[in-house]
Swiss-Prot record:
Residues 618-629 have a biased composition (Low complexity). This is Pescadillo homolog. It comes from the Eukaryota. It comes from Drosophila erecta (Fruit fly). Residues 321-414 form the BRCT domain.
Length: 629
């Protein structure tokens, strides 16, 4: 039996370097990158790099040998090779000025078909929905780009069309669940076929070209090329699941014979689709009751006692109420407010919305409509206001969706300081720091207790300040009253107008006898009380003081014992977990400290304001009393 040589088996044969992969596939580096992005092949990190690199200590980019063998049988490889042949022949025709042959070659340009790759990477539709987060975020970003060097205009327009179609599905299915405004953009989360899909829509800022090439738009464009095919398949399946016509179409009632529609019907329809304000054409009418919930309530009632089933019922009821949150409400969006995110929210939950017709096509009613219930404004004041509607800031819509109820509008009026906008994507049962505003939202009873504790502390501080401020005034008044009383006593010779030297000695003897008798009675009563106390005595308990040093020492000893019991192969993992725990505790402590300093500064400001007001009132009262005298 032949003895195997070194690096002929094991980890050395499981990995292959990028240079060897390029030689095996006979592709350039750019084509290899493109192929790996489209097929979902990525570099791997071996457990023992030196063994995987056959004894070499140089750091190389390694791939699984099985993945490269998998790429050898891909039909796209032949298309990428055809690109080289096409480039050589077209350059030759251009050099010899054979434009007739060049035109024929350009018509036969080899195109890459990615349909089979989408089916390979996502065997089921649920698998595609699970990987939809990055797809939507990237396509929403590219839909805002203008025509750049490496991003053609057709690609940006395609991204815009596909994302608008997906938003139409979200509105029609009423599957939106959570929203949040951040610096990065607008976060949306929808529940589609039981899968939670989260994506980011960037803010609408004018594009600023970058001088430095910090972002590789070419690589991102390859990702977009694959994601557009994937989202097209997904939209087709989702639209047909709701019996909606795909591509999106309008019913005949929307396409009225106006001058604008008769001039260019295609642009008229595309503008109305982008407005997100019209119902789409259905291939078959479906009752609303069938669309409400996908949960079989009869199946849940069979096992109604379990906590999980009760929780699912409550969630289903909340979702059914959320779908009709804005039903019966009419909104009007001012020109300074971002239109698209608010239209998505309002229409997803059953509301009606419109805007100024000069901003964008698709408005259904004007600002002067008397049936408008809410007008969304983002400016400090408005010249003309209607009594029949509420003027609110945009945050009210987002907070209502996250709280799943219509909140009072008084905190969101024009010019009001808005309440904190909390993220709904944070777990409420986490161990980290939770701000008091979030606690109050989770448990409304905490609002009253928190406010009551603040009022009690402020009242105590006010009482102390009042005592210190009025102490000097009280002392002066008491001293003045004492002086007046002593003067009257000396003037009239005692309380009854009789001089003390002229009193009878017999009266003094009688008074002394009465005092002695009273003292004897008091002594007897005190003796009886002491005897009764001795019979029914209760021993006072002793206060047990906890020694904090001993408790801390016991915790440290227990932690050390726990660390000793960890197996050697798990020590690095144990240290990592302890480090993460310490960093989390430190962050929580810093946030609590920051909160305490902010609250202390606010409380001190309120105290100083009240103190100054009290001093001014006291000074005014003193001045008034002087004038009265």
């Amino acid at each position: 039996m032949r003895r195997p040589k070194k690096y002929e088996s094991g980890e050395a044969t499981q990995y292959i370097s990028r240079r060897a992969a390029l030689r095996k596939l006979q592709l350039s580096l750019n084509d290899f990158r493109r192929l790996c992005i489209l097929k979902g092949v990525y570099p791997r990190e071996p457990k023992h790099r030196r063994r995987a690199q056959k004894g070499s200590s140089e750091i190389k980019v390694l791939y699984h040998t099985k993945d490269i063998r998998f790429l050898l049988h891909e039909s796209i490889v032949w298309t990428l090779r055809d690109y080289k042949i096409f480039a050589k022949k077209s350059n030759r025709d251009r050099a010899i000025k054979d434009f007739r042959n060049l035109k024929r070659r350009l018509a036969l340009f080899p195109e890459i078909k990615l349909d089979h790759i989408v089916k390979e990477r996502y065997p089921t539709f649920i698998d595609a929905l699970k990987d939809l987060d990055d797809c939507l975020t990237l396509l929403f970003l590219f839909s805002t780009f203008p025509s750049l060097h490496l991003i053609p205009r057709e690609q940006s327009n395609l991204c815009r069309r596909l994302t608008i179609e997906f938003l139409h599905y979200v509105i029609a299915s009423k599957s939106l669940r959570k929203v949040f405004i951040s610096i990065k953009g607008y976060y949306f989360q929808a529940e589609i076929k039981g899968q939670k899909v989260t994506w980011i829509v960037p803010h609408y800022y004018p594009f600023k070209p970058q001088s430095r090439q910090e972002v590789d738009f070419k690589v991102m464009s390859i990702f977009v090329e694959f994601y557009t095919i994937m989202l097209g398949f997904t939209n087709f399946r989702l639209f047909h699941g709701l019996n909606l016509a795909y591509p999106p179409q309008f019913p005949s009632s929307v396409l009225q014979d106006s001058e604008e529609s008769l001039k260019d019907e295609a642009s008229f329809v595309s503008d109305r689709i982008a407005a997100l304000n019209f119902e789409l054409l259905r291939t078959d009418k479906v009752q609303e009751d069938e669309e409400e919930l996908d949960i079989d309530m009869e199946l849940l009632e069979q096992d109604g006692d379990s906590k999980r089933i009760i929780k699912m019922k409550q969630e289903a009821q909340e979702v059914s109420r959320l779908r009709t949150l804005f039903k019966g409400l009419k909104f009007f969006i001012n020109r300074e407010v971002p239109r698209e995110p608010l239209v998505i929210l309002i229409r997803s939950f059953g509301g009606k919305v419109s805007w100024d017709s000069s901003i964008f096509a698709g408005s259904t009613y004007d600002e002067g409509d008397e049936t408008i219930t809410h007008q969304i404004v983002d400016r400090p004041s408005i010249t003309t206001q209607y009594i029949s509607r509420d003027y609110i800031q945009p945050q009210w819509v987002f907070d209502c969706v996250n709280q799943r109820q219509l909140l009072p509008t008084n905190k969101y009026f024009i010019g009001e300081t808005l309440p904190p906008h909390l993220s709904p994507f944070v777990d409420s049962k986490r161990d980290s720091y939770i701000p008091p505003e979030e606690k109050a939202l989770l448990d409304p009873s905490l609002i009253e207790t928190h406010a009551q504790s603040d009022e009690d502390s402020e009242d105590e501080a006010e009482k102390e300040e009042e005592e210190t401020v009025d102490q000097e005034l009280l002392d002066a008044q008491l001293q003045l009253a004492y002086q007046q009383e002593t003067a009257e006593y000396k003037k009239y010779g005692g309380p009854d107008g009789v001089n003390e030297d002229e009193e009878d000695p017999e009266d003094d003897d009688e008074d002394d006898d009465e005092e002695e008798a009273e003292e004897e009675e008091l002594d007897e009563k005190s003796k009886r009380l002491q005897e009764e106390k001795q019979k029914m005595s209760v021993q006072s308990g002793k206060v047990h003081k906890v020694n904090k040093r001993q408790v801390h020492k016991a915790e440290v000893d227990e932690h050390r014992l726990q660390a000793r019991m960890v197996k050697p192969r798990h020590r690095n993992l144990f240290r990592k977990l302890i480090r993460e725990k310490q960093t989390k505790e430190k962050e929580e402590w810093l946030l609590r400290k920051k909160r305490r300093t902010i609250e202390a500064s606010e409380k001190e400001a309120r105290k100083t304001a009240k103190r100054e007001a009290r001093k001014e009132a006291a000074a005014a009262a003193a001045k008034a009393s002087k004038l009265g005298k």
